[in-house]
């Protein structure tokens, strides 16, 4: 099997802990392109958070934001767009009412947040490349939400909310993109369907794709790609689902994966 397209997650994978692209990763992507192989990214981030990376890496291929909820190109062209079903939005807000979580809603290319001083707001400002619009009432966004994120450092609390939300599993994708984020997106906005959409848009068969990621929301694309690479710092259960394990994101694990792909072509 010859790999024709590499699809990388962003946070915890492509960028380091400072949310930055390292020289080693940038050079590895250039090596990949130099031999005619494709490279693109798929992320839980909104488009605003993906675009700076696309500019730095000069990605002209379609990319995925919101785990594939939006497939788009650097020139602004949108190839597909999946919003969360309003019934799901109403339902998850009802089941989290009173829970000790911060709430973020991404809609209309904007980020709305309930708490401007939350523990992970500063990090999200960098990741999303925008400032939050603070509000407590999100009801006017129910028909056009791309992603809802419930934020807490209480792992047991988020796990409990995820369990309670299983009733929406046939109408939405509900997964943790980080240990402290519980994300709700459209049913088709998952990285399994996302990598399939990217593969189709770019014209490379799924069995000739390589997926690189670090978290549970990356596992669906591991299952559909021809080969998969898990980052070394990711959870053990995620690493177990990948074909290979590479170094962590602070040790240029993506570059290691790319070089392994180049070595066998």
Predicted regions and their residues:
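Short active-site oxyanion
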Residues: 36-40, 60-61, 147, 207-209, ...
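Active-site phosphate-binding/coordination module
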Residues: 18-120
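Phosphate- and divalent-cation-binding pockets in alpha/beta enzyme and binding domains
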Residues: 24, 49-52, 160, 194, ...
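Asp-based, Mg2+/Mn2+-dependent phosphohydrolase catalytic module
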Residues: 224, 228-265
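Residue-level signal for inorganic ion chemistry
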Residues: 32, 43, 67, 148, ...
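Conserved acidic, metal-coordinating active-site core of Asp-based
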Residues: 98-212, 216-224, 233
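Asp-based phosphoryl-transfer active-site loop
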Residues: 2-17
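Short, structured coil segments at secondary-structure junctions
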Residues: 57-59, 66-67, 168-170, 224-225, ...
């Amino acid at each position: 099997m010859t790999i024709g397209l590499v699809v990388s997650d962003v946070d915890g994978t492509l960028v380091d802990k400072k949310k930055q692209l390292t020289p080693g990763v940038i050079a590895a992507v250039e090596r990949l392109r130099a031999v005619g192989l494709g490279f693109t990214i798929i992320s839980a981030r909104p488009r605003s958070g993906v675009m700076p990376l696309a500019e730095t890496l000069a990605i002209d291929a379609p990319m995925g934001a919101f785990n594939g909820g939006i497939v788009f190109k650097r020139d602004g062209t949108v190839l597909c767009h999946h919003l969360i079903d309003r019934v799901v939005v109403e339902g998850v807000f009802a089941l989290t009412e009173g829970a000790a979580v911060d709430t973020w809603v991404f809609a209309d290319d904007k980020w709305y947040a309930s708490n401007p001083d939350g523990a992970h707001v500063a990090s999200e400002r960098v990741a999303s490349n925008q400032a939050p619009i603070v509000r407590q009432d999100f009801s006017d966004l129910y028909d056009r939400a791309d992603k809802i994120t419930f934020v807490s450092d209480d792992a047991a609390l988020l796990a409990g909310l995820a369990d309670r939300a299983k009733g929406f599993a046939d109408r939405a994708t509900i997964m943790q993109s980080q240990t402290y984020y519980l994300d709700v997106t459209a049913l088709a906005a998952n990285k399994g369907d996302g990598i399939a959409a990217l593969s189709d848009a770019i014209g490379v068969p799924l069995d000739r794709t390589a997926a690189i990621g670090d978290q549970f929301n990356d596992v669906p694309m591991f299952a559909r790609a021809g080969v998969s690479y898990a980052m070394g710092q990711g959870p053990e259960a995620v690493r177990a689902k990948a074909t290979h394990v590479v170094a962590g994101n602070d040790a240029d694990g993506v570059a290691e994966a790319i070089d392994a792909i180049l070595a066998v072509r």
